[in-house]
Amino acid sequence: MTAKAQVKLYTRPGCHLCEEAKREILAANCSQDYVLEEINVETDPALVEHYGWEIPVIIINGIKAFKYRVTAAEFRSKLKRLSRS
């Protein structure tokens, strides 16, 4: 059995692009292949310093995969590519 990919979605409250990104991730219909962790950058000053307003950011298995916008098809494709061992 292959381990699930680790997906981190860096967001902040009131961010409409963040909401869109999460919708697209969920619309990709491949949730069986990953574990999603949504992280509010405002909870950690270091994250605010690092990301500022440049969110959403999607990290797959430790690799920055997307910034700002993503489609369900793009997410599925990159998840598959970055999940290969």
List PLM regions with ranges.
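Local sequence-structure signature of Cys/Sec-based thiol-disulfide redox active-site neighborhoods
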Residues: 2-27
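Short Fe-S-cluster ligation motifs
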Residues: 43-56
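Thiol-based oxidoreductase modules, predominantly thioredoxin-like and allied folds used
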Residues: 34-45
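Generic recognition of short, well-ordered alpha-helical segments
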Residues: 20-23, 50-53, 70
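Conserved segment of the thioredoxin-like fold in thiol-based oxidoreductases
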Residues: 23-35, 52
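Non-catalytic, surface beta->alpha helical segment in thiol-disulfide oxidoreductase systems
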Residues: 63-85
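A short, hydrophobic beta-strand/beta-hairpin element that forms part of a small beta-sheet core
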Residues: 56-64
